[in-house]
């Protein structure tokens, strides 16, 4: 077996190449001692197994403990600590000179190296030609031109790994005699301590460049002081010598014929990064994403809903009736397992549409620019602009968004991002929005969803601002991010990335929703006295009584006593937001007698025909939904006979539904998110996030509902609005007091 490390600069296409090399044969774990995700994969060439470890993207292997991210530390340590046979160095052909700096450091390890020269098609389009044979000769290692996103050159790269055994010699750098003597003395000291010649050579260069994580700097201090007395800093001399050598190589192998594509990127950036237009363009992109997800994805939602309802709910119920199964078994299987499957599959088109659009923004190169657009606004409030990159990930799931905060340099910025990320609307919340949009906002639903996403972003920024003023005071780190050239992503790549994200989401959602639906079905079938109810709605069930006990707490935000299923949905939503839809779907179906199956009513072929018929019907109305949403289809009027109809009667109209959605958006993160907050920060920040999110969610929902209903009961509304305002002020005061308390404790500890 051959074990290879995959390393390169950020945005060089390393992850795309990793996916192309390993396909689906990947494993995800954690690096020892830290929470950074470790990705490994493997593939077979004949009978030879090759294992690939994907290292985090880095610009340099110099790891200075001051201001280094966990990702950079992992990459720097891995090339030393891991057992491997060769290194695959991914280089962006459009930025050859910049990326060869990391290559020059890798050569000093003395290990076999294969250079994967990626994005050759983009380089050619930008008028850049590279003589790969001459580059291979000058570097002394294999150089394989590839286009990872099209799988071009990947088989040749795989074959090269079979013959990758020749150790690479370091580049010959032009250094002064004094500097070279210091490096030689440093190398000899390391050899005398038992290091192999290759590692001694590598360590001497890293130590001279200021690497504080090697662990051997103490005994070399005298040599470094000697150098400082004679001439410039050695780290500067080494960097200058590297760039000089790299420039010589690039001059010999690279020619620029035309920069038309570069001009296109520059011209487009003048618009996208315009001082006044950049922010409106960013919001327009976000708006288009929700428009695309709700309208395009929603056009296929009825197909998945009707077909799975016919097969898994009505079909399983009918079959069990034919087998004379007890009512409680029918309820458990049809309205439990069947409804869980139906719920999970129904929101696939909306989630898939959003993942597709997110992949489009990311692969095109726009998402990196979005971080720069919001950087100025966030830094004005003392918040790190780099936080926005993990927060964008939160549109898919809050868990990887929080984990992505580890790429930030300072501990303060990491903690701020961890606390801000849960307010980003994840894809599970989008599934909830889609259900309520269908029931309460059939016209212009994308505007409702856009407003919720915007409120989530604003609340995240507000949370960061409050923490910056209280418990996490300090200055934001500057944003340093490479802007990739604009790409025209291939449909195959977009579909592949969408499929990978969707499969993970459906698996995660399904394994939670289906068991929860079964449990809810059981609790709704068991009476308070311990008996078993029939398949009809039971107001004496355990679930009903628990929900009715808690429901008065939510009365100020418009949830009335008879709408206890909505309360239960919030409770189960703390387990996972995906479960909310399943809870509502299951309970409203049972409360409203929806889904009761009899042999006379079940029509399998009719249901499947209706499912397929919904696609052209919804697509025919797509134009009016996109361009004239106010007069969009009236097809949703038939929802009065379904779960949506039951929901619309239980909630206090659109105002009550929107107040409920505000609470869903802002309240306590799911258990997975809470666990990762504790993992990435600590228990104190986890509980702070729980309390803060609940208070903010409750106050926002109550203030909105009472404000909307102010004319109906002005005195009551005024009392609630004032009470919520005071509760927020109290929590803010606690934050501020806790900071002072911490300050006194630290001062006492230091004396």
Curated annotation (Swiss-Prot):
GO MF annotation list: ferrous iron transmembrane transporter activity; GTP binding
Topology of this chain in the membrane: Multi-pass membrane protein
Transmembrane spans: 276-296, 341-361, 385-405, 422-442, 447-467, 512-532, 539-559, 657-677, 685-705, 715-735
Keyword Protein transport attributed: no
Occurrences of domain FeoB-type G (ranges): 1-167
Residues the entry annotates as binding GTP 3: 54-57
Binding site for GTP 2: 33-37
Domain of life assignment: Bacteria
Annotated binding of GTP, by residue: 118-121, 147-149
Any Gene Ontology CC annotation: plasma membrane
Amino-acid positions noted as binding GTP 1 in the UniProt annotation, renumbered to this chain: 8-15
CDD domains hit by this protein: FeoB
Localisation: Cell inner membrane
Keywords tagged on the record: Cell inner membrane, Cell membrane, GTP-binding, Ion transport, Iron, Iron transport, Membrane, Nucleotide-binding, Transmembrane, Transmembrane helix, Transport
Function of the protein: Probable transporter of a GTP-driven Fe(2+) uptake system.
Similarity comment: family membership: Belongs to the TRAFAC class TrmE-Era-EngA-EngB-Septin-like GTPase superfamily. FeoB GTPase (TC 9.A.8) family.
NCBIfam families in UniProt: feoB, PRK09554.1
Protein name: Fe(2+) transporter FeoB
């Amino acid at each position: 077996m051959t074990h290879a490390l995959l390393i390169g600069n950020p945005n060089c296409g390393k992850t795309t190449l990793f996916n192309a090399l390993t396909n689906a044969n990947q494993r995800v774990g954690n690096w020892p001692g830290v929470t950074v995700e470790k990705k490994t994969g493997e593939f077979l060439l004949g009978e030879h197994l090759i294992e690939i470890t994907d290292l985090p993207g880095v610009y340099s292997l110099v790891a200075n403990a001051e201001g280094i991210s966990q990702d950079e530390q992992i990459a720097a340590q891995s090339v030393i600590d891991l057992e491997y046979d060769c290194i695959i160095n991914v280089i962006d052909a459009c930025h050859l000179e910049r990326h060869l700096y990391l290559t020059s450091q890798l050569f000093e390890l003395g290990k076999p190296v294969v250079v994967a020269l990626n994005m050759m098609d983009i380089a050619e389009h930008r008028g850049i030609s590279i003589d790969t044979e001459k580059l291979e000769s000058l570097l002394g290692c294999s150089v394989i031109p590839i286009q990872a996103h099209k799988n071009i050159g990947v088989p040749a790269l795989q074959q090269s790994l079979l013959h990758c055994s020749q150790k690479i010699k370091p580049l010959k750098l032009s250094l002064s005699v004094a500097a070279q003597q210091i490096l030689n003395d440093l190398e000899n000291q390391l050899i005398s301590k038992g290091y192999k010649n290759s590692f001694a050579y590598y360590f001497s260069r890293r130590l001279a460049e200021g690497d504080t994580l090697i662990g051997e700097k103490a005994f070399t201090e005298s040599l470094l002081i000697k150098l400082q007395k004679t001439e410039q800093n050695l780290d500067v001399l080494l960097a200058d010598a590297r760039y000089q050598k790299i420039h010589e190589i690039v001059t010999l192998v690279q020619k620029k014929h035309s920069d038309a594509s570069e001009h296109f990127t520059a011209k487009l950036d003048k618009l996208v990064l315009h001082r006044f237009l950049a922010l409106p363009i960013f919001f327009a992109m976000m708006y288009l994403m929700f428009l695309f997800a709700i309208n395009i994805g929603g056009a296929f939602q009825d197909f998945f809903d009707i077909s799975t309802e016919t097969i898994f709910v009505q079909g399983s119920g009918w079959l069990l009736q034919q087998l004379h199964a007890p009512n409680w078994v029918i309820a458990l299987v049809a309205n439990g397992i069947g409804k869980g499957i139906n719920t999970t599959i129904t929101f696939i088109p909306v989630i898939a549409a959003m993942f597709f659009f997110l992949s489009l923004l990311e692969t095109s190169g726009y998402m990196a620019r979005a971080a720069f657009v919001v950087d100025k606004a966030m830094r004005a409030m003392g918040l790190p602009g780099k936080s926005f990159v993990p927060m964008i990930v939160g549109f898919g799931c809050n868990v990887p968004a929080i984990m992505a905060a580890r790429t930030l340099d300072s501990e303060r910025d990491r903690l701020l991002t961890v606390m801000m990320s849960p307010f980003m609307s994840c894809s599970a919340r989008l599934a909830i929005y889609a259900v309520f949009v269908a029931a309460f906002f059939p016209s212009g639903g994308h505007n409702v969803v856009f407003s919720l996403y915007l409120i989530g972003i604003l609340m995240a920024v507000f949370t960061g601002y409050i923490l910056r003023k209280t418990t996490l005071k300090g200055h934001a780190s500057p944003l340093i991010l490479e802007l990739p050239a604009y790409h025209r992503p291939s449909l195959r790549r977009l579909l592949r990335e969408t499929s990978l994200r969707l499969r993970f989401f459906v698996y995660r959602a399904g394994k939670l929703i289906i068991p929860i639906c079964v449990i809810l079905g059981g609790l709704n079938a068991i009476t308070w006295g311990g008996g078993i109810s029939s398949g009809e709605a039971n107001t004496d069930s355990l679930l009903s009584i628990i929900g009715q006990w808690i429901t008065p707490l939510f009365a100020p935000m418009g949830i009335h006593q008879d709408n206890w299923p909505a309360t239960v949905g919030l409770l189960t939503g703390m387990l996972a937001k995906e479960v909310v839809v399943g809870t509502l779907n299951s309970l409203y179906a049972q409360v409203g007698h929806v889904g009761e199956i009899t042999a006379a009513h079940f029509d399998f072929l009719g249901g499947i025909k209706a499912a397929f018929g919904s696609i052209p019907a919804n697509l025919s109305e797509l134009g009016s939904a996109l361009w004239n949403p106010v007069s969009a289809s009236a097809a949703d009027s038939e929802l009065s006979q379904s779960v949506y109809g039951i929901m619309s009667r239980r909630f206090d109209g659109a105002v009550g539904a929107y107040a409920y959605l505000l609470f869903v958006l802002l309240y306590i993160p799911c258990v997975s998110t809470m666990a990762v907050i504790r993992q990435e920060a600590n228990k104190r920040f986890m509980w702070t996030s729980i309390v803060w999110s609940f208070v903010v969610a409750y106050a926002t929902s109550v203030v909105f509902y009472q404000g909307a209903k102010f004319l109906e009961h002005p005195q009551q509304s005024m009392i609630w609005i004032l009470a919520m305002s005071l509760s927020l002020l109290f929590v803010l005061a606690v934050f501020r007091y806790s900071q002072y308390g911490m300050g006194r404790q630290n001062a006492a500890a230091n004396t």
